[in-house]
Amino acid sequence: MKAVHFGAGNIGRGFIGLQLVKSGYDVCFIDVNAEVVEALKTRGAYTVGYAAEEAAVEEVSRVTALNSQTEAERVVEAIATADVVTTAVGPTLLARIAPLLAEGLKQRTTTQNVFVIACENMIEGSSHLQQEVMHYLESTPGNVFFPNAAVDRIVPLQHHEDPLYVEVEPFFEWVIETKALPDDYPVFEGVTYVADITPFIERKLFTVNTGHAIASYLGALFGKETIAESLQDVRVRRGVQSALYETGWLLLEKYGFDPKDHSAYIQKNIKRFENPRIHDEIVRVARSPIRKLGPRDRLVKPARELMDRGIEANGLALGIAAALTYSDPNYSEYSELNTFIEQNGIQETVATYLGLEADERLSQLIVSQYEQMHPMSDSIA
């Protein structure tokens, strides 16, 4: 069995590619990092380490790679004969890989089903990828399926002498939606299959991603450098817990999760964030602020839904305000956001980037919190 995976980064090697190999697939990674691609070609294997008390390593073989910039024709050929195509490139890059993916699907001559799965931190990632691919196809072939998925594993920024070595946390979750799939859908090791993935995507997005993001922005506000360090500060911990209790209430209201089970889920994820063996830097977790502050993402969406139900989203508003105070000169999105705030003010920024009008109660909560913490962070201690 053959799998093509777009993205030979840490998530690709340390999570998706690893599980595909464990499930019996020969994996061809697609990437633009020449060093990583050549190393995968030459060695055909790499090592995954686990950040746990009992440190362990795992050898991953039956892998190769192609450079999508210099070997586009071979990438198309690989897609044309693959059983499975997966991605872990980041939501903003799905449009960039769509032309190659579309061409590969066009050139398929077999009637065998192929499954394209976007393993990204976003709602309905595969559906979004399908829309991007359809810009280059007249119609979706009947034997091509785009099941949506939810994925979860913390893989921090890291640097090793071996360009292929990657260290990950032991925990992972990969959920795939079976709705509209044929009976012969692929079964991967360690993957959960559900008829409706929406509750699982939102549970993960509104717990793991919301909590992680707020820990990073509040941590930065108080001078921390890593997520684990941030959670040691009672002010950050209290802020994260407050936001996750709010999103927890929303998830129970919408999907009927068991209260005890969800409370345990929250605590389990806070413990994951606290793992001292994972050096997860705030600069990594805080990236892509414009997307994360968007009206359909991990912060504003649950806050707005809570407010619509008559619940004050104070914890989420605090996290959103902290995100608006954060700055990183190495990322253009922060330059854009910070410049817009300086030139237009916080109220107009909230309207433009968060989609919240000035008369909305949530907007007022966010602006009030922002004005209290900016520029003096001690005002919210």
Curated annotation (Swiss-Prot):
GO terms for biological process: mannitol catabolic process. It holds the Pfam family Mannitol_dh. NAD(+) binds at A3, V4, H5, F6, G7, A8, G9, N10, I11, G12, R13, G14. Signal peptide: none annotated. One of its GO terms (cellular component) is cytosol. Transmembrane segments: none annotated. The keyword Oxidoreductase applies. Its EC number is 1.1.1.17. It catalyses: D-mannitol 1-phosphate + NAD(+) = beta-D-fructose 6-phosphate + NADH + H(+). The keyword Oxidoreductase applies. One of its GO terms (molecular function) is mannitol-1-phosphate 5-dehydrogenase activity. Keywords: NAD, Oxidoreductase. Belongs to the mannitol dehydrogenase family. This is Mannitol-1-phosphate 5-dehydrogenase. The gene is mtlD.
